[in-house]
Amino acid sequence: MARVFNFSAGPSMLPESVLSRAAAEIMDYHGSGQSVMEMSHRSKVFEEIMDEAQNLFRSVLSVPDNYDILFLQGGASTQFAAIPLNLLNGSGKADYMLTGQFSTKAYKEACKYGDIRVVASSKDKTFSYIPEVTRDDFDPEADYAYICLNNTIYGTKFPYIPDTGDVPLVADVSSCFLSEPLDVSKFGIVYGGAQKNVAPAGLTIVIVRKDLVGKSRDITPAMLDYKNMADNDSMYNTPPCWSIYMCKLVLEWIEKLGGLEEMKKRNEAKAKILYDFIDSSKMFSNPVRHCDRSLMNVTFVTGSDELNAKFVSEAAEAGFVNLKGHRSVGGMRASIYNAMPVEGVEQLVDFMKEFEKNN
């Protein structure tokens, strides 16, 4: 069967060249006589994979030396608790911007551990825009401020990095990791699940400024303690070896393409093709404020639940899968992450044009 174009919000497509290389190495990794899936995480050969992956991540994303890169487990959702447990160590206060479901979940989890304030929210318009804030909106005594940089469900993305002054800014970048350059130095923590742009599900990456490490609460579980994981080189327990290996291959792929500047150009071009058609369509529409539109997750509707369902069904039959919007909002969503080729977007638009013509 021919490969389909997978528009899933995650897990998502992986580059075909990466899949081919992984397939070629699956039985015998570099003459070791074993698969990465079965080798000991304490072996020299896997330690080399781990080191290469971390070094590549630092190089590709230009992560400064005063940041630790942690390869963890538990998904981004586990960090909803880990972040306050590691950072609420001064005033016990934190500021959150609520721009979608995941920042809201993170806020609710953090409320268990301290005095958490909502500094801005776009819930009033179904999270269809990013609120504008200034430094004066943030509490200078807060231990940290929190945002979700790209909102997978609603198709929005911060068009700016909030100025929080001396308060460390924490960002969930799960759905925009490695999609474009990011100035890590503007953040205290950048983290995300890998299953959208970086690797298969199972790996969570936390980039944390070193001065924020080692101040966790006494009740912090060992598996959530950043210092514990940093001191043990992310191998306090058995890490997700296969996902880390795949992360290494994806990083090599990005580097070969020309790095994150080139990736940004590719992603902007793909998004423009899709948004331009939606904006010109008489059937399809996008509810997001233009300046806040995501490059990764493009949401759209027909205006009719019946037509939406028909579109999703017929699209799947034509080889465009996982276009159904999140259950909380309905409609459609095309997630066009790094590995989605421009041909996939072009062919989707051709299908949308034909669907509009026939309906």
Residue ranges of model-derived segments:
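A glycine-/small-polar-enriched, mobile loop at the entrance of the PLP active site in fold-type I
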Residues: 3-54
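Conserved N-terminal alpha-helix of the aminotransferase class I/II PLP-enzyme fold
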Residues: 33-79, 86, 101, 109
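PLP-dependent enzyme catalytic core of the Aspartate aminotransferase-like
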Residues: 2-4, 317, 330-359
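Active-site C-terminal subdomain of aminotransferase-like
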Residues: 194-275, 289, 358-359
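Conserved PLP-binding catalytic core of the aspartate aminotransferase-like
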Residues: 284-315
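Conserved active-site segment immediately N-terminal to the catalytic lysine
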Residues: 170, 184-195
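PLP-dependent aminotransferase-like
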Residues: 77-145
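Active-site phosphate-binding strand-loop segment of PLP-dependent enzymes
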Residues: 10, 110, 121-177
